[in-house]
């Protein structure tokens, strides 16, 4: 009866949620189900279906892949730049952002974006989903591919058995996809990337570290200014080396999953290549150093350009910069390790750098889009660069900042000194639109929107600049074949939406980047990988000629006109881009360098056959089998089922059973049902069977948008109760519903609310060992949280900012007419952190909390007093845990005192926490299992309050407690993918209760805990 009612309730909720997501649309063929968020995006369907079909057929033939399910694609416009993501767990799905790509430094190819996305993302799907005989057995046994669940860690083992190739490092997945994308697009890919060549050429030139496999994951992706991009760089480079050395066919054999293949990616590598992956990686590093030394010799055939550093270190990622003659400083956005992203001012003579304004939501590589008004001293810049960009302005003299337009979605800003207008390129709904803003920059006007699709020769634009007299607009156009053209357009024509003009120079397949006018308007300076190395080029407006003004060993970018005879440019280094001064004079010549990609192309002709033909025009009416509103429940069904082991109320009472997982395509709707049985005679007969069910809905459009969760259970068991000391399972039945959403994205503020009904409980739901005097009660809560904390590159925790929350909770106990009562509690928390200027990554946090219980007047003998109290004590971590590493930061733990041993109706708590810099392990372990980092935190807190339910002769009982503690955390990585954390803590506490008038020393507490799936 209980299970039937629970299932009926959850299904009814599911059908309700179906209608709430009705604004989503879907178009389905036999192979793909495309879900899109706006009817404005429907124009992309023919191109997407065509490129998907073309790429999918190629992958299936090359890898011998036979799909057992169709693929779901979510097509959305949640960010300003195009991007993609794919996963094969538990179902095959792809998520694509339809915006134009970010072409900065040619880190992305300029080929048609849907074609490129399908080449790349389908490689992920095919190489991770492809099963052999053993995988198919486990998928059949568990009724699907198993996703890991933090609630039941045994799912880790089941997930690996059903999809072993999913469990490989990111460099393996991204390197494979980049390798395939490059050949499928007929050499237009990052295997031929000049940026990639520059990165490793610079490492060899500077004799810098080229990480091994473990070091890349433990240090390279976290402390380097390029962070996660290193997975693409290293993965592409190593896989290209392996293919070049052993043959591209060996690569296909390695990433495929035939019946005789090994499950783990390193074991399969040894089987295919006959050498361990560690040895092959070492061989690649030796080869790389030799290859790049030869390239350096080619560059040095001609005199290299001398330079004078402007700063004493690399600045990580940098934006476009401006030199202000009034202050003698350059202004630009910077984003580098151990510092928060910011608008910075760098003194050209001294190199001293100071912060002008913080940048929230900085981007890797370009940081922010900027434009400068030298007369007013106003610098315009964008924030939230990973989503919908906002336009801000800061005065570089007063450092006063102001938000101009929220969600403008524009970048490539340029300031017209002639009429004070601001120009930019806005990305929306897959289109690029040139826009213009007039003072006070509160609204914009669309000048020209570039079309998208095969019928348009030019479909994207970037890199805008305006001549000093305002008569000429410079812009780069991109065509469907990935060719960039630097154009000069008379402003009189541009204002009318006519962007036909003069092509300045044919840079062949290399993109002209960051071209800016000199202050006198006679020249334009920019960079290009024309020779394979990024150098600075000068265009003479009068002579109509282009000459190279640098010959650099690494790469020069983002020129800033300084004087007639000098330029400031950004030189690539291992620490990022460093501003340097170079002479403004033509160089003798520059030499081309070699690319590994072309070596593969010439040495292994088979890759030339991997170039896909142009996607065919397709008649959607003939292949579409369904079109209309997207109904998540139409694809809702069983995703997997597997055995579980849990415990009920005591680690000594294990319970055995099964968990069933349900899911719709894309995971918008999820559900699970766990049924376990406790065979122990010590458990009452009516408590031996345990039920727990959950339904989760993510509604992304409409008035009900947000996250909804519905949970119900009876005598529910819990895996982590097998270990203690915190026990989560309770006797009794319950039904809860909760809802959360972000109500203000700018501040930001998140709202959460919930309702619950409980019956048969002997203990409070949230506090073990605290008796619920009456076993039937109702609860409700409403909370608001604010999170504005930031971390610097290379950190492992939030380092500065503020975190706040305010919550209201009420429990209604309908005991009887005389004692039924509402127990309401108010809780507020505020934390503030700052970086100490002693060493890098040394934050100090002040964490405060206060609570007040509205207990009323008659409370001295209330039998339900526990509902109105706050309880404190202990670290709270179990031996094996999942609820957070730093539990002591919450208001209710109190390391050094027993769990829930302290009770209060009103309290104030203050904690100080010092987080020491992390210790990173460059190579401790193997790709299968390794250590990532270790850190230590020191904390101390004071708790003072009163307990209105406990009286002394002088009134309510006053309590005072203090503690001091330390916690060490060690990050562990399993399967090259799964992160866990081993924590060791020690706390000492003392308490003062006024009825004893003495301080009481608690027994010191030691905590050891392994956090699963952190």
Which stretches of residues belong to each language-model region?
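Juxtacatalytic substrate-recognition/specificity segment
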Residues: 22-163, 169, 221
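Multi-bladed beta-propeller domains
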Residues: 295-316, 346-368, 383, 393-414, ...
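Beta-strand C-termini and the immediately following turn/loop, strongest in propeller blades
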Residues: 311, 324-325, 331-338, 369-375, ...
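Acidic/His/Gly-enriched intrinsically disordered linker/tail segments
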Residues: 91, 113-117, 131-245, 249, ...
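C-terminal outer-membrane beta-barrel translocator/porin domains of Gram-negative envelope proteins
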Residues: 717-718, 725, 737, 766-938, ...
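Outer-membrane beta-barrel initiation region
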Residues: 301, 334, 341, 528, ...
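Feature captures outer-membrane beta-barrel proteins of Gram-negative bacteria and organelles
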Residues: 538, 656-664, 685-712, 727-745, ...
């Amino acid at each position: 009866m209980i299970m039937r009612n629970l299932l009926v309730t959850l299904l009814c909720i599911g059908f309700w949620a179906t209608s709430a997501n009705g604004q989503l649309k879907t178009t389905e063929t036999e192979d793909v189900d495309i879900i899109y968020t706006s009817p404005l995006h429907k124009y992309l369907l023919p191109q997407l279906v065509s490129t998907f079909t073309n790429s999918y057929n190629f992958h299936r033939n090359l890898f011998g892949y036979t799909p057992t399910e169709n693929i779901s694609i979510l097509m959305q416009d949640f960010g300003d730049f195009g991007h993609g993501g794919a996963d094969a767990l538990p179902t095959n799905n792809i998520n694509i952002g339809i915006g134009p790509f970010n072409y900065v430094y040619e880190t992305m190819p300029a080929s048609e974006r849907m074609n490129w996305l399908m080449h790349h993302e389908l490689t992920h799907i095919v190489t991770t989903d492809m099963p052999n005989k053993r995988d198919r057995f486990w998928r059949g046994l568990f009724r699907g591919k198993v996703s890991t669940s933090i609630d039941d860690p045994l799912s880790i083992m089941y997930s690996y058995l059903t999809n072993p190739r999913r469990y490989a490092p990111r460099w393996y997945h991204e390197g494979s996809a980049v390798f395939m994308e490059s050949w499928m697009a007929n050499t237009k890919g990052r295997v031929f990337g000049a940026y990639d060549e520059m990165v490793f050429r610079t490492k060899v030139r500077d004799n810098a570290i080229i990480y091994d496999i473990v070091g890349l994951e433990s240090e390279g992706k976290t402390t380097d200014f390029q962070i996660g991009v290193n997975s693409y760089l290293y993965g592409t480079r190593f896989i290209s080396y392996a293919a070049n050395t052993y043959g591209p066919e060996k690569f296909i054999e390695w990433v495929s999953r035939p019946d005789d293949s090994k499950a783990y990616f390193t074991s399969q590598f040894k089987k295919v290549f006959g050498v361990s992956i560690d040895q092959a990686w070492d061989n690649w590093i030796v080869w790389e150093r030799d290859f790049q030394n030869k390239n350096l010799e080619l560059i040095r055939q001609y005199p290299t350009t001398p330079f004078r550093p402007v700063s004493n270190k690399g600045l990580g990622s940098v934006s476009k910069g401006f030199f202000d003659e009034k202050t003698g400083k350059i202004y630009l956005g910077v984003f580098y390790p151990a510092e928060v992203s910011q608008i910075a001012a760098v003194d050209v003579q001294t190199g001293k750098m100071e912060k002008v304004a913080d940048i929230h939501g900085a981007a890797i590589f370009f940081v922010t889009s900027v434009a400068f008004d030298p007369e007013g001293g106003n610098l315009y810049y964008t924030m939230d660069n990973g989503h919908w960009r906002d336009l801000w302005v800061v005065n570089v003299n007063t450092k006063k900042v102001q938000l101009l337009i929220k969600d403008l979605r524009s970048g490539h800003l340029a300031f017209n000194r002639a009429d004070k207008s601001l120009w930019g390129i806005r990305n929306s709904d897959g289109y690029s639109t040139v826009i213009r803003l007039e003072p006070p920059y509160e609204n914009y006007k669309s000048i020209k929107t570039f079309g998208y699709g095969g019928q348009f020769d030019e479909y994207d634009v970037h890199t805008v600049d305006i001549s000093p007299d305002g008569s000429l607009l410079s812009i780069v156009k991109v065509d469907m074949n990935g060719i960039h053209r630097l154009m000069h357009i008379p402003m009189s024509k541009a204002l009318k939406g006519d962007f036909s003009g003069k092509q300045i120079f044919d840079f062949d397949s290399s993109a002209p980047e960051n071209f800016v006018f000199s202050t006198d308007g006679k020249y334009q300076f920019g960079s290009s990988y024309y020779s394979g190395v990024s150098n600075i080029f000068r265009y003479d407006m009068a002579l109509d000629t282009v000459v190279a003004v640098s010959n650099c060993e690494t790469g020069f970018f983002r020129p800033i006109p300084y004087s007639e005879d000098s330029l400031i440019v950004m030189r690539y280094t291992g620490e990022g881009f460093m501003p340097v001064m170079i002479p403004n004079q033509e160089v003798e010549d520059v030499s081309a360098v070699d690319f590994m990609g072309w070596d593969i192309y010439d040495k292994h002709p088979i890759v030339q056959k991997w170039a896909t033909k142009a996607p065919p025009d397709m008649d959607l009416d003939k292949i579409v089998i369904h079109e209309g509103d997207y109904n998540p429940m139409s694809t809702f069904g069983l995703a997997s089922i597997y055995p579980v082991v849990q415990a009920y109320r005591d680690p000594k009472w294990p319970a055995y059973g099964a968990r069933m997982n349900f899911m719709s395509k894309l995971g918008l709707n999820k559900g699970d049902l766990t049924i376990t049985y406790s065979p122990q005679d010590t458990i009452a007969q009516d408590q031996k069977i345990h039920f727990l069910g959950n339904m989760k809905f993510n509604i992304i459009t409409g008035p009900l948008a947000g996250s909804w969760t519905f949970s119900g259970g009876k005598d529910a068991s819990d895996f982590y109760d097998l270990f203690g000391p915190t026990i989560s399972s309770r006797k009794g039945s319950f039904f809860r519903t909760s809802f959360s959403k972000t109500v203000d994205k700018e501040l930001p503020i998140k709202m959460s609310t919930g309702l619950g009904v409980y019956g048969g409980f002997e203990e409070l739901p949230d506090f073990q060992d605290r008796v619920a005097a009456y076993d039937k009660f109702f609860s409700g809560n409403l909370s608001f949280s604010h999170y504005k904390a930031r971390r610097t590159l290379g950190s492992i925790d939030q380092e500065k900012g503020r975190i706040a929350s305010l919550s209201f909770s009420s429990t209604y106990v309908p005991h009887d007419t005389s004692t039924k009562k509402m127990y309401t509690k108010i809780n507020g928390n505020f934390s503030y952190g700052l970086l100490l200027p002693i060493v890098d990554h040394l934050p100090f946090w002040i964490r405060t909390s206060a609570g007040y219980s509205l207990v009323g007047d008659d409370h001295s003998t209330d039998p339900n007093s526990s509902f109105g109290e706050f309880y404190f004590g202990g670290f709270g971590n179990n031996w094996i845990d999942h609820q957070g590493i730093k539990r002591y930061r919450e208001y209710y733990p109190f390391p050094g005192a027993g769990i829930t041993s302290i009770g209060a109706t009103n309290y104030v708590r203050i904690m100080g926490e010092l987080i020491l810099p992390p210790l990173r392990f460059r190579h401790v372990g193997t790709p299968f299992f390794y250590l990532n980092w270790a850190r230590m935190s020191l904390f101390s807190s004071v708790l003072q309050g009163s307990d209105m339910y406990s009286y002394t002769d002088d009134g309510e009982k006053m309590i005072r407690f203090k503690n001091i503690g330390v916690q060490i955390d060690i990050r562990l990585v399993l399967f090259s993918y799964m992160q866990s954390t081993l924590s060791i803590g020690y706390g000492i506490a003392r308490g003062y209760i006024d009825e004893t008038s003495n301080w009481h020393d608690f027994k010191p507490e030691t905590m050891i805990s392994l956090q699963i799936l952190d």
